[in-house]
Swiss-Prot record:
This is RELT-like protein 2. Residues 47-68, 135-164, 177-212, 247-302 are annotated as: Disordered. One of its GO terms (biological process) is positive regulation of cell-substrate adhesion. The chain crosses the membrane at residues 15-35. Induces activation of MAPK14/p38 cascade, when overexpressed. Induces apoptosis, when overexpressed. It is a single-pass membrane protein. Its main location: membrane.
């Protein structure tokens, strides 16, 4: 039996190892590239040496000139910078160029000055005499950014005292305003005493100007009682009718009916001697003592 010689090695074993190493290095490079790509998307920086560091000026964000600009001003500027919105604004303003303020970006202004010719397609406004907004830029003077007027902000209102002020934050003290019917001490005034000028109800003034107590300051007049309807329509004097024509002719022959009519007329009419009772709301009582006088002479004869 022949034994294998120790100096001879199979040649295929070294070739396999070479292919395996190349494949491992290729996979490692591919994985590293993918890792750097993912980290770059997340905001990380991947560099191979210290000499290839980027400049600090490129990493810093661009500084905004208008740091104190409000949100509303930013929105207005974005709207005006749009070409379509600027053209619509120009058409709305019409010929009054002094009133309209169109803010132009610095990039468009420098490009138009350097090139000398408008770098846009000329738009033709159908049915309008307004020129193109891009062509009219060279004719206009450079516009200045208009800020908010601060004249009205510093004016203090009447009755206000500024206690603390930082920027737009301000603390003011407002004095309490008293009403027309209230004193400084908080007690309300009573203006119901008429022309007496706050005079007490139990004190009145005499002709000499000295106050006099014990009399009422306000005198109320009692309303006059309205005339009765029966008295207005049927005038009565001493229990008899003044006008004899009001008595029916058919009742003249019968003294009893005429007496009853006179008594009923006296009862319906107001009593001349009791005006105060009717005014005070008390019922009047009929006085029957005068019935004998109200009877005609014919009834007495019978």
């Amino acid at each position: 039996m022949s034994e294998p010689q120790p100096g001879l090695e199979p040649p295929q074993h070294g070739l396999y190892m070479l292919f395996l190493l190349v494949l491992v290095f290729f996979l490692m490079g591919l994985v590293g590239f993918m890792i750097c790509h993912v980290l770059k998307k997340k905001g990380y920086r991947c560099r191979t040496s210290r000499g290839s560091e980027p400049d600090d000026a490129q990493l810093q964000p661009p500084e905004d000139d208008d740091v104190n600009e409000d949100t509303v001003e930013r929105i207005v500027r974005c709207i005006i910078q749009n070409e379509a919105n600027a053209e619509a604004l120009k058409e709305m303003l019409g010929d009054s160029e002094g009133e309209g303020t169109v803010q132009l970006s610095s990039v468009d202004a420098t490009s138009s000055l350097q090139d000398g010719a408008p770098s846009h397609h000329h738009t033709v406004h159908l049915g309008s005499a307004a020129p193109c907004i891009h062509c009219s830029r060279s004719k206009r003077p450079p516009l200045v950014r208009q800020g908010r007027s601060k004249e009205g902000k510093g004016r203090p209102r009447p009755g206000e005292t500024t206690v603390f002020s930082v920027g737009r934050f301000r603390v003011t003290h407002i004095e309490k305003r008293y009403g027309l019917h209230e004193h400084r001490d908080g007690s309300p005034t009573d203006r119901s005493w008429g022309s007496g000028g706050g005079q007490e109800p139990g004190v009145s003034q005499v002709a000499g100007g000295q106050p006099r107590t014990g009399t009422a300051a306000i005198e109320r007049l009692l309303p006059e009682p309205p005339p009765s309807q029966a008295a207005a329509t049927h005038p009565v004097q001493n229990g008899r009718l003044k006008d004899a024509s009001l008595v029916p002719c058919t009742l003249e022959g019968t003294p009893g009916t005429s007496a009853e009519l006179n008594v009923g007329t006296r009862g319906t009419g107001p009593s001349p001697g009791l005006p105060s009772q009717e005014a005070n709301g008390q019922p009047t009582k009929l006085d029957t003592s005068g019935q004998q006088d109200s009877l005609p002479p014919e009834a007495g004869g019978m």
